[in-house]
Design a protein with these regions (language model features):
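Rossmann-like NAD(P)H-binding beta-loop-alpha module
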Residues: 137-185, 221
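Glycine-rich Rossmann-fold phosphate-binding loop(s) that bind the pyrophosphate
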Residues: 13-16, 130, 152-154
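Redox-cofactor binding/interface segments in oxidoreductases and associated redox assembly factors
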Residues: 94, 107-108, 150, 226, ...
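Beta1-alpha1 glycine-rich phosphate/pyrophosphate-binding loop at the start
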Residues: 2-75, 163-185
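Phosphate-coordination loops involved in phosphoryl transfer and adenosine-cofactor binding
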Residues: 6-8, 144-147, 207
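A Rossmann-like FAD-binding core segment of flavoenzymes
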Residues: 76-94, 100, 167-263, 315
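FAD-site-proximal beta/loop scaffold in flavoenzymes
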Residues: 122-144, 217-220, 230-309
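Glycine/serine-rich phosphate-binding loop and adjoining beta1-alpha1 elements at the start
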Residues: 96-140
Length: 319
């Protein structure tokens, strides 16, 4: 088991909330800080992944900090996959069998894409566009994609449609609602986007859902079937039907879960010295007109700043 000579802080996740906590902690303390991420060892801008695929920038340009920034600031960055947490004995168990102890744990594990529920959802060529690994998979498949079906009427769905369209792929966008993003946009603006999507050569199917994904002989995607009985040949299905807190690995940790990690206004869990921030945190008593889970970049940053103050002696509530 890896131990540190000083009381150490371990942060699970290097998204905006985890990295903000690490940076603000480092400004106030010299305690050992370790940042663990399964996705990539260093912080990067997730929203810029589409521009990497479209050829507008290299992946390195999505990283706001040079790689040596972390070492210069004595922040230990590790790319590893955590299998389980023992909240009582205070150690992490990695998928490779190694363990790491902690004195303070900050869970900033973010979100995970929701999975399609129809048959064929686990075929090669069916995935979301959220992680860097999704970008890598899409890149590896691109040469064999002639037609793609995107499921979901949100921002990630339209971005993925634009990405594939930029490479000359035939794209069909399936939206359950009767107009694109009409739960957020006024009716006129939503309909204007419908027209804009179709004017750019993307087929838009409204009030439509996916019924099944049929496999090819090679185990990839051959076609999809909609709830209206239409068969659409394709080699790729993009699942962009929203996200959920990434907390499945915590089920045996002793940490109380709801949809996310349950925390009070000080971002504390039910176990001492274990906290949760960002997309994975669920407020037990959210403020009036606020949601229990706020999966937003800005609120994730504020949570990171707030918790850093608390851990350095200035106890502060998240607001």
């Amino acid at each position: 088991m890896k131990d540190f000579p000083k009381k150490n802080i371990v942060i699970l996740g290097n998204g905006i909330s985890g990295i903000t906590a690490a940076r603000h902690l480092r400004k106030r303390t010299d305690r050992p800080i370790t940042i663990i991420s399964e996705e990539h060892p260093y912080f990067f801008s997730r929203t810029a992944l589409m521009y990497v695929y479209m050829g507008h920038m290299p992946f390195e340009a999505t990283q706001p900090y040079e790689n040596d920034f972390w070492k210069k600031n004595n922040l230990n960055c590790i790319q590893a996959s955590v299998k389980n947490i023992n909240g009582q004995k205070k150690y992490l168990e990695f998928k490779n069998g190694e363990t790491m102890s902690f004195d303070v744990l900050i869970i900033a594990s973010g979100s995970k894409p929701n999975q399609l529920s129809c048959p064929g959802n686990d075929l090669h060529g069916v995935h979301g566009m959220y992680h860097k690994q999704d970008l890598d998979r899409l890149e590896s498949l691109s040469h064999s994609i002639k037609s793609a079906v995107i499921v979901g009427g949100g921002l990630i769905g339209i971005e993925l449609a634009e990405m594939l369209h930029s490479r000359g792929k035939k794209v069909t966008l399936i939206v359950r609602e009767n107009s694109f993003w009409n739960r957020v946009l006024p009716d006129a603006e939503s309909k204007m986007i419908n027209s804009h999507i179709e004017a750019h050569g993307i087929r838009l199917l409204l009030e439509t859902e996916l019924k099944a994904i049929n496999p090819s002989e090679q185990g990839g995607v051959k076609e999809v079937i909609t709830n209206k009985g239409e068969v659409i040949p394709c080699e790729y299905v993009g699942s962009t039907i929203g996200v959920s807190p990434n907390v499945d690995f915590l089920k045996d940790s002793g940490i109380t879960l709801g949809r996310g990690v349950l925390v009070n206004s000080f971002l504390e869990t039910n176990l001492p010295d274990i906290y949760a921030i960002g997309d994975c945190a669920e407020q037990t008593q959210p403020q009036i007109n606020r949601r229990p889970i706020e999966a937003v970049w800005y609120t994730g940053r504020i949570m990171g700043e707030t918790l850093a103050k608390t851990l350095c002696g200035k106890r502060e509530q998240y607001r």
